[in-house]
């Protein structure tokens, strides 16, 4: 239990520091680099899930966890060996109450992701999909790659606030498709993942530009949204349209908040 707690703390600390460092390392391309960073997160998360299943079946659960921890250990040792002058100072952590809308949007982003992704298998099984077919639907997460990578490109040209609003308009369209029969339902989930990761990249980039205090609080709010999703989704197992309605209300709230600012 202690090891799992430490693992979770480390998993939250790394992105908080990373998104705070990006504007310092790449001041002229902060939005683009933040988008690429989030695309890497999507790819790594997807590969981790796939490899975990394959390795656990072939080697065992403990051996799979050990194998997957080796790249993180190697990167940690590499970072320890870097000269101190290569890393710009972050400065003191400042906690800005004006960033409350940003924290709220962070919570909404992961809530929508996990809340609907956890409910989708039950909906698909009710519609007659086989378990193997349900598993393939989760390849939709791969569409978060172009969504994340394009977010910085669009933010640099349209402005981050406008791009953020466009992303959540796309989320609302995707939620509407979830209420339709297949194949529209599957297309809606694909679009949902793409637009959620677009918005997530922009929100992460905005948090990073405000310093380590804001970026750390943003990451904490993000994971809090995921925790709430895990607690809430069992209440909607047989009420998928109602769950989509809740998701639409939260997406509309995020659209109205639009906390991403050009800096």
Which sequence ranges carry the predicted segments?
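Extracytoplasmic gate region of multi-pass secondary transporters
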Residues: 99-148
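A late C-terminal transmembrane helix in Major Facilitator Superfamily
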Residues: 210-240, 247
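Cytoplasmic helix-loop-helix junction between adjacent transmembrane helices
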Residues: 3-41
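Helix-to-loop junctions at the C-terminal end of transmembrane segments
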Residues: 147-160, 237
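Juxtamembrane intracellular "pre-TM" segments in multi-pass secondary transporters
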Residues: 82-105
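C-terminal transmembrane helical hairpin of 12-TM major facilitator-type secondary transporters
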Residues: 161-203
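Short hydrophobic/small-residue motifs within alpha-helical transmembrane segments
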Residues: 42-43, 141-143, 223-224
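Helix-loop-helix hairpin linking two adjacent transmembrane segments in secondary transporters
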Residues: 28, 35-83
């Amino acid at each position: 239990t202690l090891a799992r707690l430490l693992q979770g703390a480390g998993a939250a600390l790394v992105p908080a520091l990373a998104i705070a460092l990006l504007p310092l390392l790449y001041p002229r391309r902060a939005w683009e680099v933040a988008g690429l960073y989030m695309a890497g997160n999507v790819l790594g998360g997807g590969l981790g899930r796939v490899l975990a299943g394959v390795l656990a079946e072939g080697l065992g659960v403990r051996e799979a966890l050990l194998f997957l921890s080796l790249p993180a250990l190697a990167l940690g040792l590499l970072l320890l060996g870097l000269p101190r002058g290569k890393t710009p100072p972050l400065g003191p952590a400042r906690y800005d109450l004006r960033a409350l809308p940003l924290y709220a949007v962070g919570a909404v982003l992961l809530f929508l992701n996990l809340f609907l992704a956890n409910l989708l298998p039950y909906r698909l099984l009710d519609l007659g999909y086989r378990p193997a077919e349900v598993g393939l639907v989760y390849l939709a997460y791969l569409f978060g790659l172009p969504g994340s990578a394009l977010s910085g490109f669009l933010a640099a040209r349209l402005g981050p606030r406008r791009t953020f609003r466009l992303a959540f308009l796309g989320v609302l369209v995707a939620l509407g498709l979830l209420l339709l029969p297949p194949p529209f339902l599957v297309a809606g989930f694909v679009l949902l993942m793409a637009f959620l990761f677009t918005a997530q990249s922009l929100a992460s980039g905005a948090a990073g530009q405000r310093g380590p205090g804001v970026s750390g609080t943003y990451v904490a709010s993000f994971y809090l949204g995921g925790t709430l999703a895990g607690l809430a989704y069992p209440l909607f197992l047989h009420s998928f349209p109602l769950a989509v309605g809740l998701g639409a209300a939260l997406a509309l709230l995020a659209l109205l908040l639009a906390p991403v600012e050009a800096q």
